Amino acid sequence: MPLQPFKTSNLLTMGVELELQLISLSNFDLTAASPDILELLGRSSFPGSFTPEITESMLEIATDVHEEYEQLLKQLFHIRDTLVAVGDRLNIGICGGGTHPFQMWSDQRIFNKTRFIEVSELYGYLTKQFTIFGQHIHIGCEDGNQALFLLHSLNRYIPHFIALSASSPFVQSKDTLYNSARLNSVFAFPLSGRAPFVLNWDEFSLGYFEKMEHTGIVKSMKDFYWDLRPKPEFGTIEMRVCDSPLTVERAAALACYMQALCSYLLENKEPLPHEDDYLVYNYNRFQACRFGLDGTLVHPKTYEQILLREDILTTLRRLKPYANQLNSTMALEHIYEITHKGSDASFLREKYAEHRTLESVVNESLKQFRSSK
């Protein structure tokens, strides 16, 4: 089946998807509660959309399409409050975080949905290990060529989003020494990584995608787990590298950071993307996952070594006029605060040092999600 035409969207509109953890309040482990929560959510109106995820201890929510920060944040608050209220009725906690600190993948149950069962049969144990939690950010594009230009222009900024959103330092009761350990699980899948370097939509659709479809490896764009991928049915590009933040404020701020970056890039403020930009892509990605804001990058054009934190601060200064135009100044102030106060990964490690139990770390995550304002 050919790839559908790229739908025209209003430029720089945005939407957010969040994968959230469902927590048993008796032991703070994950709990297979999504069937019950989905049933309860389906009985009344919901300020967005909700869907199951691949295992039953996960829930995905999505916002509507928005143009500005305040609209997006308002809806995320409404979604959060609705989820918390439903969770309270079922005695289920809900929180962000890219990984649960001590859950065992073998305990997870695959959600009873045809696609999830097919994925489980194909990938085996990797499917249950995919009980990880990310934020996906969509930015509207006017056509497929523009989408591919932005997708490849953003490649050098991927480490920014990994480090700023990092919230997965613990896996199966161990400190991994990574700030974002979640992405290591994604990288295990054969269709992960980055998109092929193609800047023309017809070439991507009729050339690359059709060839991949004819191999029998893929059926749709959903089969690609790329860090950034086009979504022709929505008319967007979708960034998939972010851990789910602990608060919805951070989720909104990250979306607006991407929106402002896209506005900046569309004015051709930087050299055009090139295949060779990806020579340092995996290394820079690793630096952001492992060291977070303290990582070191290699600039893909100059090969200069730069500090990740300083690169974000430099970028924020460049984006200031674009944030003003987009009414997202407060969102970028939040990004600035992360560079100075630390990421959610740092917060979680601090709470572990304070309480010395991972159950307490989960409890702190629950508090962060429900009490943020």
UniProtKB/Swiss-Prot annotation:
GO terms for biological process: modified amino acid biosynthetic process. It comes from the Bacteria. Transmembrane segments: none annotated. It catalyses: L-cysteine + L-glutamate + ATP = gamma-L-glutamyl-L-cysteine + ADP + phosphate + H(+). InterPro entries: GCL_type2/YbdK_subfam (IPR050141), GCS2 (IPR006336), Gln_synth/guanido_kin_cat_dom (IPR014746), YbdK (IPR011793). The keyword Nucleotide-binding applies. Keywords: ATP-binding, Ligase, Nucleotide-binding. HAMAP family: Glu_cys_ligase_2. Belongs to the glutamate--cysteine ligase type 2 family. YbdK subfamily. ATP-dependent carboxylate-amine ligase which exhibits weak glutamate--cysteine ligase activity. This is Putative glutamate--cysteine ligase 2-1. It comes from Legionella pneumophila (strain Lens). The lineage of its organism: Bacteria, Pseudomonadati, Pseudomonadota, Gammaproteobacteria, Legionellales.
